[in-house]
């Protein structure tokens, strides 16, 4: 079945769907994604994961459900929301970079652009993105390189970061994006030599 954007957004907001996506990710992370022999499966050192949520409420629900799915219901560090309403977002981003216990960050757009989290190994999309420039920026969060020793400082069971995984729960990779032309500004003329 092909879903409309509205139907798709409803399905990812549904707590049962969020739970299913997170359980599927949890079950695949060491069996299908990070299954190299030198990487010991350890959910306490889940690869640093950034989840893109639709809005603030969606992010809150994802955090709540992720705590249950990953067995960290009484842990306020393992999975956290980084949004404009989360308090000191710069400090949260810094903690996500360096704190071994902070494994999953959930954001709407705050960490989508211009933020460097080198040990990030997984991007999980639970929202669609129509804008090509925004989508490219969001994907760019995963391509940052990091030295092996630096990675192991925050993810002790990691060996090296040779790639990152983009987990597409909503079909974000399957459709064309829009490039909005600039408005109310000077036009750009391209000259090539």
Q: Where do the language-model regions lie?
A:
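Interdomain helical connector at the RecA1-RecA2 junction of SF1/SF2 helicase-like NTPases
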Residues: 1-46
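Conserved RecA-like P-loop NTPase helicase motor core
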Residues: 74-182
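Conserved helicase motor "Helicase C" RecA-like lobe of SF1/SF2 P-loop NTPases
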Residues: 31, 43, 53-81
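Pre-Walker A (Motif I) flank of P-loop NTPase domains
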Residues: 45-48, 102
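Structural motif corresponding to the C-terminal cap of alpha-helices
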Residues: 25-36, 70, 96-109
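Short helix-terminating capping/connector loops at secondary-structure junctions
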Residues: 35-46, 73-77, 158-161
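Long, largely alpha-helical accessory region at the distal end of helicase-like NTP-driven motors
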Residues: 4-10, 20, 24, 170-193
């Amino acid at each position: 079945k092909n879903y409309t954007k509205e139907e798709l957004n409803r399905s990812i907001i549904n707590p049962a769907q969020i739970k299913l996506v997170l359980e599927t990710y949890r079950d695949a992370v060491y069996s299908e994604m990070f299954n190299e022999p030198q990487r010991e499966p350890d959910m306490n050192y889940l690869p640093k994961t950034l989840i893109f949520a639709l809005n603030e409420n969606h992010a809150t629900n994802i955090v709540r459900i992720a705590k249950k799915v990953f067995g960290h219901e009484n842990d306020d560090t393992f999975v956290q929301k980084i949004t404009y309403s989360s308090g000191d977002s710069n400090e949260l981003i810094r903690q996500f970079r360096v704190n071994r216990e902070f494994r999953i960050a959930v954001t709407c757009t705050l960490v989508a652009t211009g933020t460097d989290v080198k040990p990030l190994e997984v991007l999980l999309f639970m929202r669609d993105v129509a804008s090509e420039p925004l989508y490219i920026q969001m994907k760019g969060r995963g391509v940052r390189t990091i030295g092996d020793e630096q990675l192991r400082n925050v993810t002790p069971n990691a060996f090296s970061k040779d790639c990152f995984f983009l987990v597409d729960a909503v079909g974000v990779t399957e459709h064309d994006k829009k490039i909005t032309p600039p408005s109310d500004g000077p036009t750009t003329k391209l000259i090539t030599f």
